[in-house]
From Swiss-Prot:
Residues 92-103 have a biased composition (Polar residues). This is Protein hunchback. Residues 17-30 have a biased composition (Basic residues). Residues 16-60, 90-196 are annotated as: Disordered. Residues 176-196 have a biased composition (Basic and acidic residues).
Length: 196
């Protein structure tokens, strides 16, 4: 009955009309009977029609949506810090990268790379050192340059590949996606709880 009453109320603007109607019923003293038959008429008659349906539906969707919004906001607040740092970390490399390997070079990426790189490169200088100390100097410099170049490359390439262009987009997307998924998941479970 409520939604039957509510629907017309929302659907057609005649709130005043509704009011008036109500009033008329009241003065007629047929209010109970009339409103009953009225809501009955409007309900069955309208519920096949998309009248109370949308309102109740939209209300439901709205509720869900609102709940989702709230959840998202909460989630964003919770996730903001980790996510932000994550996205920021993913983002900064792109700028810091081009500034040549600034300290923010994603700790995750080149560090392993750097540790691998020197490891790979170290044998060669050492080997060279054993051969000729004289050659060692150039090699070392070469190695260092190679390392730097490599590092620059590393800084640019892998992150470029893995981090900057794709990553901020990707990690942000995944942030969003994770959020969305999370949201949907927690939402549905909450909804189930809610519905049940």
């Amino acid at each position: 009955w409520y939604s039957g009453m509510f629907a017309p109320n929302i659907k057609q603007e005649p709130i005043s009309h509704h009011h008036h109607h109500h009033h008329a019923h009241h003065s007629y003293h047929q209010h109970p009977h009339d409103s009953n038959s009225n809501s009955n008429a409007s309900s069955p008659h309208q519920s096949p029609l998309p009248s109370p349906n949308p309102p109740s539906n939209t209300n439901l969707q709205l509720e869900q949506y609102l709940k989702q919004q709230q959840q998202q906001q909460q989630q964003q607040q919770q996730q903001q810090q980790p996510m932000d740092t994550l996205c920021a970390a993913a983002m900064t490399p792109s700028s810091s990268n081009n500034d040549q390997n600034s300290p923010l070079m994603p700790p995750g990426l080149p560090n392993p790379m750097q540790s691998i790189m020197p490891a790979n490169l170290r044998p060669s200088p050492t080997a060279t050192t054993t051969t000729t100390p004289a050659a060692a100097a150039p090699t070392t410099t070469a190695a260092t340059i190679a390392l730097q170049a490599n590092d620059k490359l590393q800084a640019l390439t892998p992150p470029m590949d893995v981090t900057p262009p794709k990553s901020p987009a990707k990690s942000q997307q995944s942030c969003a996606e994770r959020e969305k998924e999370h949201d949907l998941m927690s939402n549905s479970s909450e909804d189930m709880k809610y519905m049940a």
